[in-house]
Amino acid sequence: MVKIELDINGISFFVNTTWKTDTVPAVGDIVIVDKESISQFDRVELRKTPSNQAFRWADEEDNAPVLEHFDFDTEMVVKKRTWKFDSEDEEMVCILKVAFLCFEE
């Protein structure tokens, strides 16, 4: 299991996934976040969307606070990927620093 910490504008979100470490999002990958399923407090599962090779956040419960700057499907790009060691759980944590993608209409 890989622990992932998503850094969005300095706010950390924690994610569990069963993927191997080399399959976590890389720099330049697109991360798609549904505002109904993002939370600072709940662990959510990172799922891969096969059709476009993007990544979607999905939560089983709808008790997460909604962040105002998220839209229905907010796209973000991974700007930096680093690793740290979690001494409490004795495993590596992948930290993804992401930035919002803005499209002008």
Spans of model-derived segments:
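Short alpha-helix capping/helix-loop boundary micro-motifs
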Residues: 13-21
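Hydrophobic residues positioned within well-ordered beta-strands of beta-sheet architectures
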Residues: 4, 74, 94-96
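Short solvent-exposed strand/turn elements
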Residues: 79-80, 87-105
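Short, compositionally biased
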Residues: 41-87
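Short, surface-exposed secondary-structure boundary micro-motifs
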Residues: 36-37
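Short, basic/aromatic beta-hairpin or loop at an interaction surface
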Residues: 1-13
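Short, well-ordered loop/turn sites that connect or cap secondary structure elements
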Residues: 22-29
